[in-house]
Amino acid sequence: LTAAAFQSGLTSAADLYIGGFDTHSTHDSLHEPLLAFSTDAIQLFWQIAEEKGIADRVTLVIGSDFGRTPHYNSTDGKDHWPIGSVVLMEKNAPWTNKIIGNTDEGHNAQKINPDTLEIDEKNGTVIYPKHVHKAVRRYLGIENSSVEENLEFTNTEDFNFFA
């Protein structure tokens, strides 16, 4: 349905949701099938996008509002953790196979230099969702558009994740 809406021009963006990841107990047995389902869903999305001839116009952003703790709780679950990740996918993207950001041995975010994208505890900053969204908006050419007028990110470090 989403790919058909893109193909017809009815929409240029959509949110797709897969739930069940909030696993405060029996984490592994719940996450394993969810991750497999997610992988299959992403693969199917790209297959349909190819079939509909729109794959070269899609930027897929995959993320979550929070991560899971690096350790298990007393019920073999994992609780909320402020460190998450975002995956960006695009057909024939010039910025493929990059990992930007890092955590220390305690799974705490390390500071990243916005210019070099390397670990820099002195001059860097922790990457937050606002940095990713600002960079994606710029990449898509909507950073200073009327769409963003009341939703701009001010006083935010500027990362060029797509260089």
Task: State each model region's role.
Residues 65, 86, 136:
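Hydrophobic, well-ordered secondary-structure elements that form the walls
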Residues 70-90, 95-109:
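Active-site histidine-anchored catalytic micro-motif
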Residues 1-52:
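Anion-binding catalytic surfaces of enzymes that hydrolyze or transfer phosphate/sulfate esters
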Residues 20-23, 66-69, 93-95:
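Solvent-exposed loop/turn segments at secondary-structure junctions
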Residues 6-10, 53-55, 78-82, 93:
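Extracellular/periplasmic catalytic domains that process cell-envelope and extracellular macromolecules
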Residues 47-55, 103-163:
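Membrane-interface soluble catalytic domains
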Residues 42, 46-75, 80:
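Metal-dependent active-site segment of extracytoplasmic phospho-/sulfohydrolases and closely related
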Residues 12-17, 59-62, 85-88:
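Structural recognition of the beta-strand scaffold that forms the well-ordered cores
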